Regions:
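Active-site-adjacent structural elements in enzyme catalytic cores
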Residues: 1-339
């Protein structure tokens, strides 16, 4: 199949809407990362996503909508917590896991009795949903295990062939996938950190948001993934990545000791020139927002440069930085050295 990459025009929006109605795949920009969309109600269409990505089918997908009225049939109930969070953060990079409704395909939900739903803020996604009338399932538009793409060229690098259309909306603003929170049960639970933080949700809800252990640790054998990004190696370049936890002086000393051909540094802005190895900087120290915006592009650039071993500066573990750490520790296959 020849994959077209088209700029955002009324004609390309109409083509994307038509393809989705016909059960085809479309890659398109969101505020978080580029996604591959298919009609969430059409199991055969959704199977094409798993095939295109090489993604295991026990990994659930998120359903995207453009209005609260679209929740009907997708979820069986909208808990009060969900209404509060939607009022505060929708449209935006927040996914809520709710009881599943009858219209969502089993394939979309990986057979679970819950479904993750979000209302993206990106105008292109909203236009495509409105014009197609399709609530679509959409994971990130990368081959499974690789860093998520935040622009159309990186999307094409992974998806040239398996789908007919990529809409080019430029760079994504956030740079990491949406926050995922389960809003049923005794307490809300953060399943995947993102741009909407634990602290922000607690301020809206007036109660504690628990943090799933799987955010910072591997899932245990036999444990079910309730959200994308909880299972399998994710976000990884070809190089072996190790996170070095400690201040810059100790980081620099460790990198100097282990410098060799093929070794690269993934560091914060302004640090690379002080290191004896090639480097890529991925945002300001203590600034999770800039780190999130640059992380996936930095990981893909390491592949383009042929890096074999990467020593990464360790982000913090609160606010948006928790999302950066969550993605980076999976890219590193949980290799962390405390200095």
């Amino acid at each position: 199949m020849n994959t077209q990459v088209l700029p955002i025009t009324p004609e390309s929006i109409a083509l994307a809407a038509k393809l989705l109605q016909q059960g085809e795949l479309v890659a398109l920009p969101t505020e978080t990362v580029y996604g591959i969309a298919a009609d969430a109600r059409n199991g055969e269409a959704v199977k094409k996503i798993f095939e295109a990505k090489g993604r295991p089918q026990d990994n659930p997908l998120i359903v995207h909508i453009c209005g609260m009225e679209m929740l009907q049939g997708i979820v069986s109930e909208v808990p009060e917590r969900a209404k509060k969070l939607a009022a505060a953060f929708w449209p935006g990079p927040l996914t809520m896991v709710m009881p599943r409704g009858p219209e969502v395909s089993d394939v979309t939900c990986a057979g679970l009795d819950t479904v993750g739903v979000r209302m993206p803020s990106h105008p292109v996604v909203q236009q495509v949903i409105r014009e197609s009338g399709v609530a679509f399932a959409a994971p990130s538009a990368n081959l499974s295990g690789k860093p998520s793409p935040t622009n159309a060229p990186d999307t094409l690098a992974d998806m040239d062939g398996p789908l007919p259309l990529i809409l080019d909306g430029g760079e994504c603003t956030v740079g990491v996938e949406s926050t995922v929170v389960a809003v049923t049960g005794e307490h809300p639970m953060l399943l995947r950190p993102g741009y909407v933080t634990k602290e922000q949700m607690e301020a809206v809800l007036g109660e504690e948001v628990l943090v799933s252990p799987a955010i910072l640790e591997k899932l245990k054998d036999g444990e079910v993934a309730r959200s994308p990004g909880m299972k399998y190696k994710h976000y990884a370049p070809k190089a072996q990545v190790t996170i070095l936890r400690g201040d810059f002086a100790r980081y620099k000393a460790y990198v100097e000791q282990h410098a060799a051909p093929g070794v690269w540094a993934l560091c914060f802005d302004g640090e690379g020139a002080q290191l004896p190895v090639p480097f890529i900087e991925y945002g300001k120290n203590h600034d999770g927002v800039t780190q999130a915006h640059h992380l996936f592009t930095a990981l893909r650039d390491l592949d383009k440069h042929g890096a074999q071993v990467v020593y990464a500066r360790c982000p913090e573990q609160d606010g948006v930085s928790m999302a950066v750490y969550n993605r980076l520790i999976r890219a590193a296959a949980f290799r962390v050295v405390t200095l």
